[in-house]
Amino acid sequence: MIDNKVLQYCSSKLACEETMGELTIHPRVLERHPQLTEEDVRVAWENTYYEALRPDSPNFPEYLWIGADSNGREIEMVGVPTVDGWLIYHANTPLSKRTRNEVEDARRR
């Protein structure tokens, strides 16, 4: 069960860098995307330059982040806050068309 105090205090990664907590990367991410390593995802997480809450997600509160790894590749990451920090259960490079469209639509609003 997710602790609502944690979610209220740290409702987004960018809003609370100093209290981010632990980052967990689901093992399936690396199994499905062998071009990524755990280090690639962690570096991209640390270099996040785009964050969006997905309010209509069935996994609410689900976030989309985009960051750059140590090779300069853009990595899309999707995850949720947990009691201890954050769980990333999707990561991919290059950015998917769906993600690019989502970012473009958000910029138009």
Where do the model's predicted regions map?
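Ribonuclease/tRNase effector modules and their secretory precursors
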Residues: 1-109
